[in-house]
């Protein structure tokens, strides 16, 4: 697209309040087509990226043996070349799918339609049932069998153990009661490795058993959900990174070098709720599926003032200054030569949402950002701007002794917000943290997920009827998960997927520039789906400065 990329920016008026500035500003073209390529898609940052470039699902799960994750690749380095796409091309792609999708649709029908109660996931309440406790003294054999049956009813189990077979974590049940099960898992892994093979997954009788080995730990998921083995492996990697965020990779390796059968639960005692919360977030928050962060919808003028205030309220030791609201990003300012990885940001989201104690004052806690640097700790200053709001300020420092200097940054940031009139605008934005899909103006559109790959950000509307129950919301996310797994299948990735079902139609379109997943009325046609894409992309382009951070700032 040959259109200029600048947008309206904001500045302070004479009285210090927000005022738009139109000088130097040329709007992007309203239409995102033709010639849409990476860096030109709706939501693409105009002045560099905030995150390590994670162009695809595969980039998020690459081995730590790759390049240093704290450094962003140079423009044009690595990855596939940008793909130019336009509406004629997508129309042609979908026309050609009529034959190609015959087999795919059959698979989708078999795997996505509700089956028997044995196959269909449990209700959300059951899925988050507290872990089964070991039987009390004097409990009868019937009680033990009932507890075991309750444990087996869960749709997904997660286990973490050491290479010596010592239990570290289990999603349900006690580690002691499951130690023999974990021992069998380690024996299976070791047996195959003796023949120089590596076990990745087992598929049998509707179950998937997925293994991820990150020495000195082995992580295992046992699931009868519609998630692919690849996505289950991604969840296990998140759990591994969660453990590293508490210990650091260097400390973890040192512990097991000294004592191979060390019981890691001693060090992780009390952190189970953080891992539990991470699993719950991954079950309902599409941020993890998309490998991206979602921004709080906010007027560009307000966001610019918030970012500038963060930039100016800094200390020498600060690396990242982040303002969050309900697991949505409001603003992020980084040191000029450092980039955050989406996985590290998700782990910070999880840390904050897993504890209400951060609302009680200013916290100063060590935290490892494993994709940035797994060898050491940063220190994070965490505080809510006000106890009755969801605005949480996160200041990441390299100096453990710098609490008071970083705390003063918080004070100066709040002063600047009030002086510029942005504080009240933020509180008002929190009243409507999500937008309605009706604003898009596509009658049959029910919901969508859109990710800009170059910015590492995504947007989606509020989930509304007919998905207003928790069970239906989890079902919708399950449909997106399935489309995502087909689009990113390691052996046969699909660029476009079109599915028609009894309850909704689904569409996926994955390019080098963006990913789009749409859900709309089952009465729609393939032609209307293509038309809906065009309207939706035009709307996202029009609203991009409210839905994305287009001009990220640095110190």
Swiss-Prot record:
The modification Phosphothreonine is found at residue 61. Transmembrane segments: none annotated. Keywords: Guanine-nucleotide releasing factor, Phosphoprotein. Residues 1-90, 112-149 are annotated as: Disordered. InterPro entries: FUZ/MON1/HPS1_longin_1, FUZ/MON1/HPS1_longin_2, FUZ/MON1/HPS1_longin_3, Mon1. GO terms for molecular function: guanyl-nucleotide exchange factor activity. One of its GO terms (cellular component) is Mon1-Ccz1 complex. The modification Phosphoserine is found at residues 31, 56, 91. GO terms for biological process: protein secretion; protein targeting to vacuole; vesicle-mediated transport. Residues 1-12, 130-139 have a biased composition (Basic and acidic residues). Belongs to the MON1/SAND family. PANTHER family: SAND PROTEIN-RELATED, VACUOLAR FUSION PROTEIN MON1 HOMOLOG A. Plays an important role in membrane trafficking through the secretory apparatus. Not involved in endocytic trafficking to lysosomes. Acts in concert with CCZ1, as a guanine exchange factor (GEF) for RAB7, promotes the exchange of GDP to GTP, converting it from an inactive GDP-bound form into an active GTP-bound form. Interacts with CCZ1. Found in a complex with RMC1, CCZ1, MON1A and MON1B. The MON1A-CCZ1B complex interacts with RIMOC1. The MON1A-CCZ1B complex interacts with RAB7A and this interaction is enhanced in the presence of RIMOC1. This is Vacuolar fusion protein MON1 homolog A. It comes from Bos taurus (Bovine). The gene is MON1A.
